[in-house]
């Protein structure tokens, strides 16, 4: 049975309040963000690149290359681990990682194998 555990930062309440204050969730596409994801895909040689924001229940894609969905349940988000630290979070092979090997995005389309994420941090230090 897949592990559908949410990873919660100790400052989650404050982090969510900060995220809401930006009024960016569910906003329209913006060329500036799309250029970043397109460039990341080219530089990293990966088929997928995302700018994601995590609210209480979901991972929402502000910008995306290589996927046709706009959000996932937070429990499936690799990014929930990314926001737990202030540095690069990397998974070499998701099929071998206990946290992700049963994730439906690893066992099925888009068949994620490698993941690298870096937290977006605001001026107050919230990821």
Predicted feature locations:
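Charged/polar positions on well-ordered alpha helices
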Residues: 42-43, 84, 119
